[in-house]
Each structure stands twice: as structure tokens, then as C-alpha cells.
């Protein structure tokens, strides 16, 4: 999720530079709702249901790998790839910097393939026809520098911005979320997200529970977002909150609608944090092994908490990072109160 969201300002800049261009996006199926509302057409004139791109090409690589030798898998892959090539793209842009994405960009049929000169995975650059020396410390700024090269005009870093609410608006989902919140007395709420991609980035669930308890005492309903396989994580938060925390989980479209209404978001370096930042929701970001200067929340009011003892690493360790354990729940509550104007 985060990689997609970090690309949106670059897309916004390209759309501004080429307002009449047909822009498509090749994306994993599980993240397609960030670009197009469920059930909406994935190609054609842009609308509130698909506001930024003219066409969404979704691939389900995870499922395809599980049934690699199935005829139906190859048929689905061929259908997607025929759609990509039939679109007649002249330029492909790889902002992920992975071998997989670079190869797909080269095979798209586009005559020109842009990418960073020093991508995330070094061999990816072998597939680019034009390599851009990316500048800027934050990944959003680095992505924008590639867009600058394509547009051949300067898009200054201070102008880096997300389009105002860049995500699809499904009115039925929006109405349902609003009704559900009202029915459960959660008109004023904080959204907490204790999960993360791997254990080293995960602040202890018990401390999220303590934060939830403090927010409830301050008059905010603490809603806890969690995904499949994170049920035990929520139960630990609930227990530590003294029963104050309330669960919420659902589709990406539902998470977007919920996040739009949050007073504040609290979580670590994970997709929902960057979603909240893109929606300009104030965030308290709890960082450990990843560098907030490169991967932190961007474009919103924020307080980033990171211990001086944390060491930048992308090793996917299961145990919590030592420096992150030095951040107490009271520090998070102080940051939340500051952003909420409660001090």
C-alpha cells in the first residue's frame, strides 16, 4: 500500500504536465481499490470512482504463483498483458525499482522506459532505456524527480503534494461508514493501527492499549484497525485498554472512508499511516528500524517519534526493534494531545 501512495504525487505531477495523456497503472489486485472503487469500470473517462488514471491493469501475482502450472492462470495473465500492450503506451515508468516491476515495464510495449539510476534492486536498471539520477531524501521526492525528467520541467520539491483526497469516493460505502460510526457513538474518534509488515516495525500491542485508554479518557473513541491474521494483536490491545478499544476492519475502500473521518491516526511505518497522511489526517508516527526521513508521513500535520537508539535496517526480524521499545505510551499520548490542541 505504501509504495502506491508514495507514487501519487509523481502521478499528480505527470497529470499536470500531460493533461490529455492516457495514463494507466499496472498494480497488484489487492491494492487496486486505491485507484478504482470496487465494481467501477477500470478504464474510460475518469470520475470520482477512478479519479487519477484512465486505466487500471490489475495483476494477482501472489495467486498466480500458487497455481503457476494452471492453464487458467496463464489465460488470466495473457488477458492482462494483452490489455496492457493493446493500450499502446509510449512511455513506461518504474517507480518501484524492483526487478519484477522493471521487467514488466520493459515488456509493456512502451518504447521508452524510465527508472531511477540507482533503483531499490540494482539489476532493475538494466531494463530501463532512460535512467534518472533521483534526488531528495524522502521516497516521494525521489519519485517526483523521475517525473521531473519525464515532464522535462522543474517540479520544485516544495510543491510536492498529494492531490486533494486522491482516492476513489464510493458514496454507498461513505454513507454506510458514517451511519455505522453514528450508531456506535463514534462521532469523534482516533484510528490506531498496531500492525506492521514485520515484527521489528511493530510497537507493542499493550502500549497501543494504554494509548487507547488515554484517548478514551480524553473523549475520543479509540478505533483499532487490524487485518487478517492480526486478531490476537487486537485482543492484546483490547485487554490493555480495559475494554475501551473498539475493532474495525474491512476493505481498502472502507478503510479510506473511515480514515477520512478520523480526528487523528496513530501507528507505525505501514500502509494505513501513509493513507492517513495522504488524506491530511494528523498522524503520530512511531518509528523504529526504518528511516522516517525517507519513509515517514508526508503532506500532513505530524509528530514522528523515533528513539536515538534505533538503527536503520530493513531486515525483516520478527522481534520488536530495541530502540522502538524505548518509546512509552505517555510520549505517544503527549504527541496526540499536541496535534489535537489539547495541551
Per-region residue spans from a language model:
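Catalytic machinery of carbohydrate-active enzymes
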Residues: 1-343
